[in-house]
Swiss-Prot record:
Compositional bias ranges of the Low complexity kind: 228-241
Biological process (GO), any one: translation
Name listed for the protein in its UniProt record: Large ribosomal subunit protein uL3
Organism: Parvibaculum lavamentivorans (strain DS-1 / DSM 13023 / NCIMB 13966)
Record GO cellular component, one term: cytosolic large ribosomal subunit
Length: 251
């Protein structure tokens, strides 16, 4: 189980595919998403990584959090989220996750806070059909009708669909396809709509109902201290120079 990422919802647009189709996508932007701390089995009883994103002013950060950011050698963050991971997918503290953490064609689950609609009636909130437009109905055309029972049980059950506050709740949309990523600009483009308003923080994770495709970087795609993405295998490490080899032979 890999770590997710914290992204900012930029808005919606469309992308044109090579076969001429245009696909509606939501643009999500990574804003300096770094690992702030780790949770391990030995110390905490479970494994997880805490990610931070955005750039907060130091004067607006509590002293305890300032110390946490200083120990991790990262700048103060606006948003902190913890992601459960498997022990072999723990990321080092301080690394920055890049957009190619996900690949095109992969499915992800996206969580965000839905846009608030205020107080809404049952026709808008629960898709009720309303009462009849004529024949004895007076000033109750959009009401929900009876809410209770008879003398037994003599109460309204909890969870009864009625008018009330709509939106501004935590929503997860599952199995959205990643259409394209741009590691240089930190953009992830997913097909379809994503819960939340523009400028809001959104969480993106690997889809729990779909297997990971081949080519997904494990434990993830990241860079250290501004370097290029460190997802390359160890076999691609540069060979030693002849001067270094000669120095080793003469030692």
């Amino acid at each position: 189980m890999r770590s997710g990422v914290i992204v900012k919802k930029v808005g919606m647009t469309r992308l044109f595919m090579e076969d001429g189709r245009h696909v509606p996508v939501t643009v999500l932007k990574l804003d300096n998403c770094q690992v702030v701390s780790q949770r391990t089995d030995e110390k905490n009883g479970y494994t997880a990584v805490q990610l931070g994103t955005g750039r907060a002013k130091a004067k607006n950060v509590a002293n305890a959090q300032r110390g946490q950011f200083a120990r991790a050698s990262v700048e103060p963050k606006l948003e902190l989220v913890e992601f459960r991971v498997s022990p072999d997918n723990l990321l080092d503290v301080g690394v920055e996750i890049t957009a190619d953490h996900f690949i095109a064609g992969q499915y992800v689950d996206v969580s965000g806070t839905s846009i608030g609609k205020g107080f809404a009636g049952v026709m808008k909130r629960h898709n009720f059909g309303g009462l009849r437009a004529t024949h004895g109905v007076s000033v109750s055309h959009r009401s929900h009708g009876s809410t209770g029972q008879n003398q037994d049980p003599g109460k309204v059950f909890k969870g009864k669909k009625m008018a009330g506050h709509m939106g501004a709740t935590r929503v997860t949309t599952q199995n959205l396809e990643v259409v394209r990523t741009d590691a240089d600009k930190g953009l992830i483009m997913v097909k379809g709509a994503v819960p939340g308003s523009k400028g809001g923080w959104v969480l993106v994770r690997d889809a729990v109902k779909t297997k990971l495709p081949e080519g997904v970087p494990v434990p993830g795609a990241f860079r250290r201290n501004g370097e290029e993405a460190a997802a390359a295998p160890a076999a691609e490490a540069p060979a030693e120079t002849p001067a270094e080899e000669a120095g080793q032979e003469g030692a």
